Amino acid sequence: LKQIGGLATFISQFLIQFFRIPLIGSLVTALIGGISGWLFWLTLRKIHPALYLMPLAFLPILFQYLYLMKDSYHYEGLIAMLFWSLALNVYSYSARRFNWTYRTLIGCLLPPGLFYTMGSVAILFALSILLFDVLQKCERWYASFIPLLLLLIVGSLCVLGGSKPDYDYVFWMKDYVEYFIELEPFYGFSWQVALLVMLLFFLSRYLDHIKAYLKALVAVALPVSYTHLTLPTKLEV
């Protein structure tokens, strides 16, 4: 627990010990993914309540499931996404309840805490709250650069101090992959699509006037198109 990302490791190892029981692993993994996707949806609907796009909230978790099909990916990555969605939901709630000073204070506390307990997913969180504030046009949204800069400083100090061997471990997904595995672009899709989905929910406000069946078509076409473009060449184990 004293190591960076130690809580994610502790939780994942605690859960994995029960996976030898039939169906437990699948059920626990599905439950974690379901909760994470639901929490992300609660944040997305604050951007715009586009119910027909709700399935997209689970797209980042879908990629996490694909990563877990590879022996080189750690279960900590899925646990980290759960806490990312939880922290993002907490922040989005506070952004509406408090003024920009308290919002920035919360934003400065959550990324380092997430970094220490869950690892490099904190950089995704810092980018997510910045994008959320921009899309919501929050009061003094530019103050959200402060948590990002703070995390960049903390992460850099960890690398310079020897706590982490490389910047990929603090600012990218290498923290959740075996050290001897080359980090493929495929591993970044989960984080990238999370930010993309936030942007799509913002843009969906311009589609409110179209018919319901066209909205449903959009909800189906977007994830299918994305997976078709990215998966075929990236699923080799």
Language-model regions, residue ranges each:
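Membrane-interfacial interhelical loops
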Residues: 1-18, 63-73, 155-188
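Membrane-interface micro-motifs in multi-pass membrane enzymes
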Residues: 2-5, 29, 52-98, 116-122, ...
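Cytosolic-side transmembrane helix boundary signature
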Residues: 181-220
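Perimembrane helix-loop-helix junctions
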Residues: 125-144
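Conserved small/polar residues in nucleotide/adenosyl-binding loops
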Residues: 227-233
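Short hydrophobic alpha-helices at membrane interfaces in multi-pass membrane enzymes
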Residues: 96-111, 142-145
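Loop-to-helix entry region of an early transmembrane alpha helix in multi-pass inner-membrane enzymes
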Residues: 19-34
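Transmembrane-helix motifs of polytopic, lipid-linked glycan transferases
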Residues: 30-47, 85-90
